[in-house]
From Swiss-Prot:
Function: Catalyzes the cyclization of GTP to (8S)-3',8-cyclo-7,8-dihydroguanosine 5'-triphosphate.
NCBIfam families (alphabetical): moaA
Catalytic activity, reaction form: GTP + AH2 + S-adenosyl-L-methionine = (8S)-3',8-cyclo-7,8-dihydroguanosine 5'-triphosphate + 5'-deoxyadenosine + L-methionine + A + H(+)
UniProt subunit comment: Monomer and homodimer.
Descriptive protein name: GTP 3',8-cyclase
Source organism: Mesorhizobium japonicum (strain LMG 29417 / CECT 9101 / MAFF 303099)
Family classification: Belongs to the radical SAM superfamily. MoaA family.
Length: 331
């Protein structure tokens, strides 16, 4: 069974935000004094497993756990181990997660044991002081130890860096060399107008077309058709032998090939990262021990999936395109 939206796109990728909490407070993702969801509003790990399983029955082939920081959710490995049965059965092709890396020293080996093959680590700078500045609470050495642990466990690591003008743009070439030297791909992401937007956010916006032009003065970049199921467009870097990805929601949106939906830890389904329209799956999930009601709610929601997002960086307004913080939906 496949889920097909009104524009003929097959929905095969589910991103699940298992918590809105995080041990960092990255400036583009969260307010420093974030008010978190009360625990009673959260789906239990068992409910998350049940919901994910319904999506898998309906054709989801790739499942990514996100946050917040997914590895700070209490007993998260119980959910990972439960979901891994779908890898064993062949129903799910891939189970992966996006993490800030702070908890990887603790969990990397168990993730690998559960059948996770690759992970994404969000890392915007290799400068310890700048790292603390952008994450507010984070420590770079802990993340580096986590990356070491992940690679030692056999996990393939890809780095995600948000490109921020006058913050990390000058060091992105060195980050790429470092990542490729360790066998990791790097993907750079345009900052998106979500949550609280101040002057810094619009001033830090860097179109990746400019970054690519700058990189092409130093490196030989060749477009390649490589895909991981996400929106990144990849180039091969001749000088390093590695892959560099660009995620460009602002300057070259990727909506025409969108294959994903996003589920939050409260059971809210967002059909698009850049739209406010959502569907409540918690109520139908809890209304019956069977899955018919929630399956019908999913079908109805997929039927409302929009053609594209509404992101725009507008210096004339401080109003974000989307009012919720990235940490709520899972970046």
């Amino acid at each position: 069974m496949n889920m097909i939206d009104p524009f003929g796109r097959t929905i095969s990728y589910l991103r699940v935000s298992v918590t809105d909490r995080c041990d960092f407070r990255c400036t583009y993702c969260m307010a420093e004094d974030m008010a978190f969801l009360p625990k009673k509003d959260l789906l239990s790990l068992e409910e998350l497993d049940r919901l994910c399983s319904v999506f898998i029955e309906k054709g989801v082939r790739r499942l990514r756990l996100t946050g917040g920081e997914p590895l700070v959710r209490k007993n998260i490995m119980h959910l990972v181990r439960q979901l891994s049965r779908h890898l064993d059965s062949g129903a799910l092709e891939e189970l992966t997660l996006t993490t800030n890396g702070s908890q990887l020293s603790r969990f990397a080996a168990e993730l690998a044991d559960c059948g996770v093959k690759r992970i994404n680590v969000s890392l915007d700078t290799l400068d310890a002081d700048k790292f603390h500045q952008i994450t507010r609470w984070g420590h770079l050495d802990k993340v580096m130890q986590g990356i070491d642990a992940a690679q030692a466990a056999g996990l393939k690591v890809k780095l995600n860096a948000v490109a921020l003008k006058d913050f990390n743009d000058a060091e992105l070439p060195d980050m790429m060399r470092w990542a490729h030297g360790r066998g990791m791909d790097l993907t750079v992401i345009e900052t998106m107008p979500m949550g609280e937007i101040d002057a810094d956010r619009t001033d830090q916006y860097l179109p990746l077309s400019l970054l690519r032009a700058s990189l092409e003065r130093q490196f030989t970049l060749t477009d390649i058709p490589f895909k991981t199921g996400g929106p990144a467009r990849y180039v091969h870097v001749a000088e390093t032998g590695g892959k560099l990805g660009f995620i460009t929601p602002m300057t070259h949106n990727f909506c025409e090939s969108c294959n994903r939906v996003r589920l939050t830890c409260t059971g809210t389904l967002y059909m698009c990262l850049g739209q406010e329209d959502a569907a409540d799956l918690r109520a139908p999930l809890r209304a019956s021990e069977g899955n018919e009601l929630v399956a019908d709610a999913i079908d109805e929601a997929i039927g409302r999936k929009p053609k594209g997002h509404d992101f725009i960086i507008d210096r004339r307004t401080s109003r974000p395109s989307v009012s919720r913080h990235m940490s709520v939906t899972g970046g």
